[in-house]
Amino acid sequence: MEITEVRVFPVNEEKLKAYVTITLDDCFVVRDLKVIHGNTGLFIAMPAKRRKDGTFKDIAHPLNTETRERMERTILAEYDRELRKGAAPRPTGTHDD
């Protein structure tokens, strides 16, 4: 399985930092992953649905640690790129010579 596209949608909330959509093998889309700032740093939360008892159940999730870690690395790298793009816009009229 290859993550062929990652789209990051930053939000300005205390713990929720972004929503993410990924495409797998150019043929399967997973929406509503979240980049969360927790006690030990950033992590990825899988899309989930609230149950009648108030708990949450993942809609989709990796079946093993290796896949979860690969997804997390790929998504957080794209999140960092997106922040750098938005955090340091170049002033109008400047260019590198």
Swiss-Prot record:
GO-annotated biological processes: division septum assembly; sporulation resulting in formation of a cellular spore
Stored SUPFAM superfamilies: SpoVG-like (SSF160537)
Membrane-spanning intervals of the chain: none
UniProt keywords, alphabetically: Cell cycle, Cell division, Septation
Highest taxon, organism lineage: Bacteria
Disulfide pattern: none
Pfam families: SpoVG
Entry-linked Gene3D superfamilies: Stage V sporulation protein G (3.30.1120.40)
Family assignment from sequence similarity: Belongs to the SpoVG family.
NCBIfam families: PRK13259.1
Protein purpose: Could be involved in septation.
Alphabetical list of PANTHER family matching this protein: SEPTATION PROTEIN SPOVG-RELATED
Protein name (database record): Putative septation protein SpoVG
